[in-house]
Amino acid sequence: DDPLRVVRLVRLAAQLALEPDAETIALARATAPAAARVAQERVFAELKRIVAGDGVIASLALMDEIGLTESVLPELHALHGVEQNRYHHADVHTHTIEVLAQAIALQADPGAVFGAEHAAAIDALLAEPLADEVDRGFALRLGALLHDVAKPATLGRRGDGSPTFLGHDRAGAELARDVLTRLKASEKLKAHVAALTRHHLRLGFLVHETPLTRRALYRYLKASEPVEVDVTLLSVADRLATRGHKAQEAIAKHLDVAREVMPAALQWRAQGRRPPLVRGGELAAALELHNGPELGRLLGEIDEARFAGDVTTPEEAVAFAARLLEGD
């Protein structure tokens, strides 16, 4: 007997639009704990097909029903019953499934949020092969499932008893990496999903910096690359699935910022890294500096100023760096 069959049951039920009968469900429940002992690369091969499938939401519900989630994705199972603050309408697990549903809807029709003029570029990006025989669209779904995975571990309480999850983005990036390491995923997929988890809150922070400056936009893109487009999509899905106190106002503001960020993110990704206005050695010679953190900081400041349109030539870049040094 191969316990992997219970994972295949979930996949085939969705693929063939079948509803397992009571006897099959009972047998699956009895077998599900043994799935934890199956070679993880075999489990992941089936999970990839489940997550990529059209019926993934129903598949995840079936996995919960038969106890399979607890065996093969215990971190997802642990989200059940973890309450959130008043800005959420559901516990962490229900919210996570709704984020996945919103991500799937965005994947199917990005133009509904970002306009027809950007839909083709987003479609093309999500269709790009990534690693482990999956594309970026699959990775977005996986990121949706794992974006809040560290909330149980980071749960705290304010004085009034309301829950907090400070640092769940950073801790979640490590936990997402651990999950995918256990499943024998490639380093590239692990890094991609960890980055989605790590940066999924960034766009929400930008809402408090409106109207956006070019410098604020630069810092967002620089911090979140190479998932600057993907994580913008994930952030929108996350916001749309958060429907608690003052939700409509918050969603509207979030979408306004996302619509401003997305064209810049697409352009940033399409253009790639531009040759610097001035190289480190040239700047060091001009300002009589040694290689080190200070030189790196100045080069970063020049790059940000260039994005903002404040410097456009090598000479302006050197003069700008000199002014920064004088200010220090």
Where is each model-derived feature located?
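Short amphipathic alpha-helical surface micro-motifs
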Residues: R42-V43, D123, R177, R214-L217, ...
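FIC/Doc superfamily catalytic core
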Residues: L60, E70-V72, L106, R202, ...
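A generic structural signal for short, non-catalytic loop/turn and secondary-structure boundary residues
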Residues: T69, V92, V227-V229, Q271
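Alpha-helix capping/termination and helix-coil
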Residues: A103, Q107-G111, A144, D148-A153, ...
